[in-house]
UniProtKB/Swiss-Prot annotation:
Pfam family, one: AceK_regulatory
UniProt protein name: Isocitrate dehydrogenase kinase/phosphatase
Provenance organism: Dechloromonas aromatica (strain RCB)
GO terms under cellular component: cytoplasm
Family, per entry: Belongs to the AceK family.
UniProt entry keywords in alphabetical sequence: ATP-binding, Cytoplasm, Glyoxylate bypass, Hydrolase, Kinase, Nucleotide-binding, Protein phosphatase, Serine/threonine-protein kinase, Transferase, Tricarboxylic acid cycle
Lineage, highest ranks first: Bacteria, Pseudomonadati, Pseudomonadota, Betaproteobacteria, Rhodocyclales
GO annotation, biological process: glucose metabolic process; glyoxylate cycle; tricarboxylic acid cycle
Length: 593
């Protein structure tokens, strides 16, 4: 259908205008809070940072609901006929021709229409199953996606100075020239000497800093001949309010870890988000675009792109969904597609007898994880509703488990299986399986690494105000980089809501030996001394854990962590090794000079 001039001014045109106005309002608010991240960083308003991240998550759904309500009240959305809806989509496309965020606006259109239309309309005639507007080479009106620098006149040191100063932070640096010297020597060491500069030598830097927690990140790449060198420079602030360059990350894989879904989302002021994603993809080609959008705070766009990728993969693969390996959970039913690196989780209709909660509580726990700082220790999830899969792609075991444990969560419509509510997250090897493999292989070095990681995960979550609740090995996974991450959320609580207690002495020897509890226990009481009994049954594992994390087995650590959180203290979490920090490399600089 071609767009007719006669459609302008019609009901369809007014509906399309209402929808683009709804999106524009959303993105204006999104950019405003992202822009304010610079001020929060300068003012060291760390509690404000966490508050802003939590509030921003609600922005999208609030604007979608607002737009749906407007269409229902102003246009009687339920009575709009099919022809008009098709015209609305075509007119909406016309409104996106010169838009700076067309891909986000298309996703907003989908979010609104799928709340109004039946799923039979979820195809490209009515919604954007495929994108309609190219996002290639969109230029901003007010800002550049990236800035280019040439070291011919100022030299490399002078150019790095200019790059940092161009971010215009309203805080003094402790000693910027000294930090730049560190940058220079770190680069020279990484490259085993400075290569000759080609005629096209330049440094490209994304125009907005990336703000998260207590850090600002400068992200860019150097181009020399046919070679590109990605880099990231974290900028931190000391207690005196002075800034300093903490390190420079030069390995692409290490930069990629900054964008891990187990970490909090960035705040970035982007006029053209597709330009930022395109730049990031040039330095992180293995990172899916969907994950980059998510980490930029654009979760709905990330979900849209993820699902398009999944459907595309299903069209080009033949394997079937199977039950995920590992011990079956009491709350979640989990399956996976072997050829795709994700797991799919449903909330069961009936939980195990030891679980005292309902479906609504579980959903709140998953939302809680999105709103907190995951500090690289909690897997992010993508939440979907009414997802259609080819029925033939499920093996008999998965279908039987669905029918037995979650019959209200799915339905079959012809050759499609529709799952009403679903969480999707990155697949990891369950820690209990990994430990068993390492013990059987007598791989002591690897065993020590993951047990140390396990304790560090618990410690860092606690410092970020999260108590995992069920700390059994099966509730943690091991990433492909060897990092231990928590992924079972039905029992998590805020640290500040837990009462950590020491087990009181038994009144007599007989009582102590009886195996019965001799003290009163309330719902949120936790006794850290009991952890070893349930978790450290293997002598080898127990020895390693106590070597690194003995303090986690006493109330003192937990009470001190609570006290810090309640006082408003925000812990420092570094998404890179301590040995890379310039403060720990002073001798390297002295030796090179």
């Amino acid at each position: 259908m071609k767009i007719s001039v006669g459609l302008y001014g019609t009901n369809a045109h007014q509906i399309a205008l209402a929808m683009i106005q709804g999106f524009n309002k959303h993105y204006t608010l999104f950019r405003q809070t992202s822009r304010e991240a610079k001020t929060r960083f300068e003012q060291a308003d760390w509690l404000g940072v966490h508050k802003a991240v939590k509030e921003r998550i609600r922005f999208y759904d609030d604007r979608v609901d607002e737009c749906v309500e407007r269409l229902r009240n102003q246009f009687d959305a339920a009575s709009i006929d099919d022809t008009t809806w098709q015209q609305v989509k075509l007119l909406y496309i016309g409104l996106l021709l010169n838009h700076k965020q067309p891909e986000l606006a298309e996703t907003f259109f989908n979010s609104v229409t799928t709340k109004i239309l039946h799923r039979n309309y979820f195809h490209n005639d009515f919604i954007f199953v495929r994108p309609s507007i190219s996002t290639e080479n969109i230029e901003g009106d007010d800002t550049q996606t990236y800035r280019s620098y040439y070291a011919k006149e100022d030299g490399l040191r002078g150019t790095v100075l200019k790059i940092v100063k161009d971010f215009d932070w309203h805080r003094p640096f402790v000693d910027l020239e000294h930090d730049v010297e560190h940058v220079y020597h770190a680069v020279r060491h990484f490259l085993n000497g400075m290569p000759p500069r080609e005629v096209n030598f330049q440094i490209q830097v994304l125009g907005s800093a990336f703000y998260r927690n207590k850090a600002a990140y400068i992200i860019g790449k150097a181009i020399n001949g046919a070679t590109e060198y990605p880099f990231t420079i974290p900028v931190l602030q000391n207690e005196a309010g002075q800034l300093y360059l903490d390190t420079i990350l030069l390995d692409a894989w290490r930069i990629g870890l900054l964008f891990s879904l187990s970490r909090a989302y960035f705040m970035v002021d982007m006029e053209v988000p597709s330009g930022y994603v395109q730049f990031l993809r040039s330095i992180l080609p293995a990172k899916p675009r969907s994950e980059l959008y998510i980490m930029l705070g654009l979760g709905k766009q990330g979900k849209t792109m993820f699902f398009r990728d999944l459907i595309y993969h299903l069209h080009h693969s033949e394997d079937k969904f199977i039950m995920a390996p590992g011990i079956r959970g009491l709350v979640m039913l989990v399956f996976t597609l072997p050829s795709y690196p994700y797991v799919f989780k449903l909330i069961k209709d009936v939980f195990g007898s030891s679980k005292e909660m309902d479906r609504a509580t579980v959903k709140k726990k998953f939302m809680m994880v999105k709103q907190v700082d995951r500090v690289g220790r909690m897997a992010d999830t993508l939440e979907f509703s009414n997802v259609m899969f080819p029925l033939k792609r499920f093996n008999d075991e998965v279908l039987a488990e669905l029918q037995q444990l979650a019959p209200s969560c799915f339905e079959v419509d012809g050759d499609q299986l529709i799952i009403k509510h679903l969480y999707i997250e990155r697949r990891m090897e369950p820690l209990n399986i990994h430990l068993d493999r390492m013990e059987r292989a007598n791989n002591v070095e690897r065993l020590e690494h993951v047990i140390r990681e396990y304790g560090s995960a618990i410690r860092e979550m606690a410092q970020a105000n999260i108590f995992p609740g069920d700390m059994l090995w099966k509730n943690f996974g091991v990433t492909r980089f060897g990092r231990v991450v928590f992924y079972d959320y039905d029992e998590i609580e805020y640290m500040t809501d837990i009462k950590f207690r020491q087990i009181p002495p038994a009144p007599d020897f007989e009582t102590e030996m009886s195996g019965e509890v001799w003290y009163a226990v309330s719902r949120n009481d936790v006794f850290p001394e009991e952890f070893a009994t349930f978790l450290l049954t293997s002598p080898q594992v127990r020895k390693i854990f106590i070597k690194y994390h003995k303090d986690l087995l006493s109330p003192r650590f937990w009470l001190e962590a609570q006290e810090k959180i309640r006082s408003g203290y925000v812990e420092d979490f570094f998404p890179y090794p301590q040995e890379l920090r310039f403060i720990n490399r002073q001798t390297d600089l002295t030796e090179e000079q």
